[in-house]
A protein has these predicted regions:
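Generic hydrophobic alpha-helical membrane-span motif
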Residues: 94, 190-194, 310
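Conserved segment of the thioredoxin-like fold in thiol-based oxidoreductases
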Residues: 94-152, 158-169
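Proline-centered helix-kink/hinge sites
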Residues: 30, 98, 152-153, 303
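Local sequence-structure signature of Cys/Sec-based thiol-disulfide redox active-site neighborhoods
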Residues: 41-121
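Secretory targeting signatures
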Residues: 1-49, 80-82, 90, 296-328
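Long, contiguous hydrophobic alpha-helical segments, chiefly transmembrane helices and signal peptides
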Residues: 81-85, 96, 152-157, 231
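Short, conserved sequence motifs used for protein processing/export or organelle targeting and
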Residues: 127-148, 154, 170-305
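Short loop/turn segments at secondary-structure transitions that flank enzyme active sites
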Residues: 32, 117, 161, 235-237
């Protein structure tokens, strides 16, 4: 056998095997793309104009005995965040809160409930700052789906996945929420710190400092990731028997939201008075955003639906043409 014939035979084997390999890759890509599409149909993107979410949060309880404290965590250790837009008259919100309870179970999460405030005759919680936090972050996405920037109930997991109303996309609302919770945060490398240098429980004045490192991770490799730090004040439980949805004790009530200037600094804040009890916590929440990318985002296990088209083109190109077969 001549060397030329050997090379020709080898090339023929490669030509026969390569389409089979491409078909296998095509099937894998199609299957995974379909699975991801089915999963993501359970929710809406919580942000518009680019990728974004919540890296996580740090939480510190501010009791009458608290005078100072510090928390430092790597981004990978930060607690996942579930944000809920609700109202004390919202009957459907009772359904969603029970579903969240069941989906979360014993998982370690920070829940933050935004109560309707603007043009609100009943609900006593929240303020203009909490409304601003919700609308500036999720208002555009909510408007795109519902025509309104504030809809009770709305539930957002990790600042990325928004669920509206009570109609499930799968077998149940609990299943939707469990899937969304298990999808997890977008991972980054870095760390954040919150320090309360002094706190006077009588004047409610808190001196604090914060730091968040510029992240590295899948969303920051090809684009500039922008971080925004927020200081939130959340009451663990607030009793309001006059709420017409009958909950009575409203949990995780957000009383104030402060957008911090930069990723490192010091400040003085007026801690909101608890509605009742002594159970207000300060939360440092880190938002991330990055410009839209041409492809499909970081959640795709392969380079997205476009890979199917690309592999198909390669496959067709490798098939012997009819003209060549007739001439041999």
């Amino acid at each position: 056998m001549t060397r030329k014939h050997s090379i020709s035979q080898y090339s023929g084997i490669v030509v026969r095997i390569t389409p089979l390999m491409l078909v296998a890759l095509l099937l894998v890509a199609s299957t995974q793309a379909a699975a991801t599409s089915e999963q993501s149909s359970m929710w809406h993107d919580a942000r518009t104009g680019g990728d974004g979410g919540v890296i996580g949060a740090l939480e510190m309880t501010l009791t009458n005995e608290t005078t100072e404290g510090e928390i430092t965590l790597d981004y990978s250790e930060m607690t996942p965040v579930i944000e809920v837009y609700t109202a004390t008259w919202c009957l459907n919100c009772v359904t969603t809160e029970h579903a969240i309870d069941e989906a979360v179970g014993d998982s370690d999460v920070i829940r933050i409930h935004y109560h309707r405030h603007r043009a609100e005759p009943e609900d006593p919680f929240g303020n203009n700052a909490t409304e601003h936090r919700w609308e500036s972050t999720y208002g555009d996405a909510s408007t795109a789906e519902t025509g309104m920037s504030r809809v009770a109930p709305s539930t957002v997991f990790d600042g990325e996945r928004m669920h509206l109303g009570t109609s499930p996309s799968s077998s149940s609302l609990v299943s939707d929420y469990s899937t969304s919770l298990n999808a997890g945060q977008t991972s980054f490398t870095g760390s954040a710190r919150l320090t309360v240098t002094s706190y006077d429980s009588e004047t409610r004045l808190m001196q604090f400092s914060w730091n968040a490192s510029q992240p590295s991770g899948p969303e920051s490799e090809d684009s500039t990731t922008i971080l925004t730090a927020w200081l939130l004040f959340v009451e663990d439980s607030a009793s309001f028997p006059d709420g017409s949805n009958g909950i009575g004790d409203y949990l995780h009530v957000l009383h104030d939201a402060i957008e911090l200037d930069g990723l490192d600094g010091t400040g003085l804040a007026q801690v909101p008075t608890a509605w009742d009890g002594d159970d207000v916590s300060v939360v440092l929440l880190i938002d991330w955003t990055s410009p839209s990318m041409d492809c499909c985002g970081s959640n795709w296990p392969l380079p997205g639906p476009g890979i199917v088209t690309t592999l198909t083109c390669f496959l067709v190109a490798l098939l012997p043409s009819r003209r060549k077969r007739l001439s041999t």
